[in-house]
């Protein structure tokens, strides 16, 4: 029963964590004024511009927005309670009652807070990269300011791909548009006026290869198929794609973080129960995959590499080397279960 309870706890907390982090980002983005960013970018001197942008974005000494740092209080408390609950449920599998306020869980709570710290550090690095792109990029200060705001909350790689998309669309928009007047064909049918652009869309798309994904290339290809595309249309597309990437990043980080903490919490609870003699001597950890067609081959190999399971204090053999816990890599859905040696 505890396995089902832990799985339910993971699912609910993963969603809650993502929602809370996303809410913190929305609160931060609501404070960012594009006109103020544009005014700063229209100034002289890169160092002066950086200093002005840091004030506008309210960045602390680490380059993290203060509003965002303050907004991590709720996610931090959520993770601290989560790791304690998982450890308690795992310990209960051995019919041992765990003191969730004990010192044994202190390091796990620290790990939970450290996870958010790494997330904020990655965010700060990406904001720094976005600022540099805004300072040295092409386009009007207003356009660069809008792109800077879009990039907030993305990873460095996501921000770079958004810059490539923006440049491609701008190249297309900068190409003159030609109006073909209304006319009547030889059959007497009136053909309404049409717009065409002389842009070489194939060349524009080719210039993005290796810099953005196939899905992103298809997105801008569909946009450039419209000769009536306007700057407002392009901005709407970029705004929406930036939101989607930010959402994906937050969900992925939340899923991965919760998974990692859950597996660590289970092991902690089992080892505490073992220390108090609540587990039989033959109890071992067994690697379990999700058991569907999405399981990667390298992940499916792990059970066979550990046929009898492993002792609680020993790592699993995996294609990536020895690992104490899942996840093996991004998107891993494997987990450890408790049982006797096979």
Say what each PLM segment does.
Residues 229-230, 234-342:
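Acidic, glycine-rich two-metal-ion catalytic cores of nucleic acid-processing enzymes
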Residues 1-244, 249, 257, 339-342:
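N-terminal leader/targeting and assembly helices and adjacent pre-domain segments
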